[in-house]
Amino acid sequence: QKVAVRLKEVVYTLSPHQQN
């Protein structure tokens, strides 16, 4: 579960559709 959250966080951070 923690790994999934970490992965999601990383993916979100790497995602270009971030706030900035």
Curated annotation (Swiss-Prot):
InterPro entries: Cyt_b-c1_8-plants. Component of the ubiquinol-cytochrome c oxidoreductase (cytochrome b-c1 complex, complex III, CIII), a multisubunit enzyme composed of 3 respiratory subunits cytochrome b, cytochrome c1 and Rieske protein, 2 core protein subunits, and additional low-molecular weight protein subunits. The complex exists as an obligatory dimer and forms supercomplexes (SCs) in the inner mitochondrial membrane with cytochrome c oxidase (complex IV, CIV). Keywords: Electron transport, Membrane, Mitochondrion, Mitochondrion inner membrane, Respiratory chain, Transport. It is found in: Mitochondrion inner membrane. It is a single-pass membrane protein. This is Cytochrome b-c1 complex subunit 8. The gene is QCR8. The keyword Iron-sulfur does not apply. GO terms for cellular component: mitochondrial inner membrane; respiratory chain complex. Transmembrane segments: none annotated. Pfam families: Cyt_b-c1_8. Component of the ubiquinol-cytochrome c oxidoreductase, a multisubunit transmembrane complex that is part of the mitochondrial electron transport chain which drives oxidative phosphorylation. Belongs to the UQCRQ/QCR8 family. It comes from the Eukaryota. Disulfide bonds: none annotated.
